Amino acid sequence: MAQEDVFKKIVSHCKEYGFVFPSSEIYDGLAAVYDYGQNGVELKNNIKQYWWQSMVLLHENIVGLDAAIFMHPTVWKASGHVDAFNDPLIDNRDSKKRYRADVLIEDHMAKYEEKIAKEIAKAKKRFGDSFDEAQFRATNPRVLENQKKFDDLHARYTEAMQGPNLEMLKQIIEDEGIVCPISGTKNWTDVRQFNLMFSTQMGAASDATSKVYLRPETAQGIFVDYLSVQKTGRMKLPFGICQIGKAFRNEVVARQFVFRMREFEQMEMQFFCQPGTEMKWFEYWKKVRLAWHEALGMGNENYRYHDHEKLAHYANAATDIEFKMPFGFKEVEGIHSRTNFDLSQHEKYSGRSIKYFDPEKNESYVPYDVETSIGVDRMFLSVMCHSYCEEKLENGETRVVLRLPEALAPVKCAVFPLDKKDGLPELAHEIVDELKFHFNTHYGDPKDSIGKRYRRQDAIGTPFCITVDRDT
């Protein structure tokens, strides 16, 4: 089955079984805005709890925070978001659709990688255990041709994104013959920048002084509160501050279900350390965070690092942990060495010292920072994509089994009375009442056959089911 068809089935399954609904659906919905249903919210909460326990509860030098969504507007001036939080956009004149120019080019580069992967897969199937991939890559003409095209395009793209050079981005799109996915034409406008922040007015006045922003990231709340947390918690470097919360970006090209939305949730940690030690901690958290993902048992081969070619204005190192979705490897978590940029900017714009006093060195300085940031919705999608499985039954029918990691399953256990007789429902309810204080437990009404009840629990990823019969 084509991966595109698999993804459509996953989206349909999410709606049918109460994981994700289109928001405001009775009013025909709102583009790229979704609600999490009764099973989706449990899965999402379990993801957040799994992360919080591993990051906050298991580390003595990491604490939590819940900062406000609205912040003083100067915060976003200091952070660079007002002036630099932009995407390069391009329109197709025929379809009237708008795209991110960088994404169009990256998707085009991925096609060269896909061609190489197909050649390797065919050769591996043909030669079996004797296949030497390194030699094949170095000698096969088709692989070499596509690798050269990829390398040449990658070099031009990297150069264009420094700045970025908008004219060069359009030139690449034209030179590569990239077409609009809707119209199939190459009738493109010029590339221009678009700021991604949502703004609104606070209070009764509606002038420039009342302008505030919906936060585009959760990190800045940690930065402006870092000194308060450090002093009240008597924290010593290195230490981390974690936060889970909503962020908002006016994505022009929101797509791929909950992967890219305008309202989304982040799980972030800012880890503060001595200047000069940030790269050591960057490498440390890269390994720790990948191990956390792999511990879920979704296949180590489905994860990879992707180092950033173009660094954000605040970073001196950055990498993504990518997961293999049905539409390719995509970022689920970012690890960034943000230097002391953010804290220094807030010190500059606020006019207040937020330096850390190091008692061992007997000096004050602005700490450096290493960030780990997960998109909760992307994590949710990666779990659903990996867990979705169709099984062929002996009678030719197909059933869906959601093989969720047990720690994340919305319902941990379902209890089924075999039928309505001999006090079996009452006994089943007693078992549910005892278990529900420990984990989410579901009672399966005996009006349906036992087979249907089991199949429904398979479809929502329940790892354990108990049948109460006359021998119980």
Question: Which residues are covered by each model-predicted region?
Answer:
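NTP/phosphate- and nucleic-acid-binding module
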Residues: 1-472
